[in-house]
């Protein structure tokens, strides 16, 4: 079984690769992990992982730079139901649009938009609320 982590210029590839390899080894699974932008390797994989670090528009631009990648992803994930994991902005890109820095068209797989969290609670600014926020 092949797990492909797509390399489109995102910054956390090694961390994602190491996490998958550690989990595979710890559980004695028979999976191979590949980090690639090669469309044939992606097409022949069993699982696709799209990581993402950076801004929504920059990540979308990275996908567009690999000719045929967006079309292949749609075919494999949406049409052929290949298992897919989007991590961070890789997950956000499945939406219709993102509004970080500017309005950017996403993959359109999931209805909805990605918008900045407003750190308000009952119309009061929450002091020291960091964005992005984990948890």
Regions found by a protein language model. Give the residues of each.
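Amphipathic alpha-helical repeat scaffolds
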Residues: 7-15, 55
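Residues that form or flank phosphate/diphosphate-binding pockets in enzymes
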Residues: 14, 43, 102
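Short gly/ser/thr-rich secondary-structure transition/capping motifs
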Residues: 28-35, 65-68
């Amino acid at each position: 079984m092949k797990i492909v982590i797509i390399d489109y210029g995102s910054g956390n590839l090694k961390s994602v690769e190491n996490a998958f390899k550690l989990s595979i080894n710890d559980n004695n699974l028979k999976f191979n992990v590949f980090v690639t932008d090669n469309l044939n390797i992606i097409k022949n994989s069993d699982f696709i992982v799209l990581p993402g670090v950076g801004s929504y528009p920059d990540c979308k631009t990275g996908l567009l730079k690999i000719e045929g990648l967006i079309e292949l992803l749609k075919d494999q994930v949406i049409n052929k139901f290949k298992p897919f994991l989007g991590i961070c902005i890789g997950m956000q890109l499945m939406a219709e649009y993102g509004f970080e820095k500017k309005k950017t068209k996403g993959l359109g797989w999931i209805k909805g938009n990605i918008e900045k969290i407003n750190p308000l609670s009952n119309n009061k600014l929450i002091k020291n609320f960091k964005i992005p926020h984990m948890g």
